[in-house]
From Swiss-Prot:
Encoding gene, per UniProt annotation: nuoA
Name by which UniProt lists this protein: NADH-quinone oxidoreductase subunit A
GO molecular function: NADH dehydrogenase (ubiquinone) activity; NADH:ubiquinone reductase (non-electrogenic) activity; quinone binding
UniProt keywords, alphabetically: Cell inner membrane, Cell membrane, Membrane, NAD, Quinone, Translocase, Transmembrane, Transmembrane helix, Transport, Ubiquinone
Enzyme class: translocase
Organism (species): Klebsiella pneumoniae subsp. pneumoniae (strain ATCC 700721 / MGH 78578)
Record field: catalytic activity: a quinone + NADH + 5 H(+)(in) = a quinol + NAD(+) + 4 H(+)(out)
């Protein structure tokens, strides 16, 4: 087996090398061009939002509940799970029973995580103070309360 020299490697991959040089050059050109051609004005009116000729009133920031971020994180976690399971399902013939057992363990670990999230109340949308407590109808009925 013959070792390839660096000139043979370059000769084989010259088109990709030129592509990389041009791509990096264009990125640098756009960054430098934006810096040179961009505006330099720093005034009070430049930093205020403007829409349809109407000055803004109040703050443009919206405060979102942290629950929306939790839902987004859960979506990403379970979306990545689906991605791994899709990759596993396309190669199920090559992985055989070992791959099946590994996928089952993966699903069980994720289900255990989901059960944990449900048990700590991470998926509850109602505030803690407005949650209803479970009432045993035999011992804590309205008629039993009057008798005590």
């Amino acid at each position: 087996m013959r070792m390839s020299t660096s000139t043979e490697v370059i000769a084989h991959h010259w088109a990709f090398a030129i592509f990389l040089i041009i791509a990096i050059g264009l990125c640098c050109l756009m960054l430098v061009g934006g810096w040179y051609l961009g505006g330099r004005a720093r005034a009070r009116s430049k930093n205020t939002p403007f829409e349809s000729g109407i000055d803004s009133v109040g703050s443009a920031r919206l405060r979102l509940s942290a629950k929306f971020y939790l839902v987004a994180m859960f979506f990403v976690i379970f979306d990545v799970e689906a991605l791994y399971l899709y990759a596993w399902s396309t190669s199920i013939r090559e992985s055989g029973w070992v791959g099946f057992v590994e996928a089952a363990i993966f699903i069980l670990v994720l289900l255990a995580g989901l059960v944990y999230l449900v048990r700590i109340g991470a998926l509850d949308w109602t505030p803690a103070r407005s949650r209803r407590t479970l009432v045993n109808p035999e011992t804590d009925s309205p008629t039993n309360r009057h008798m005590q």
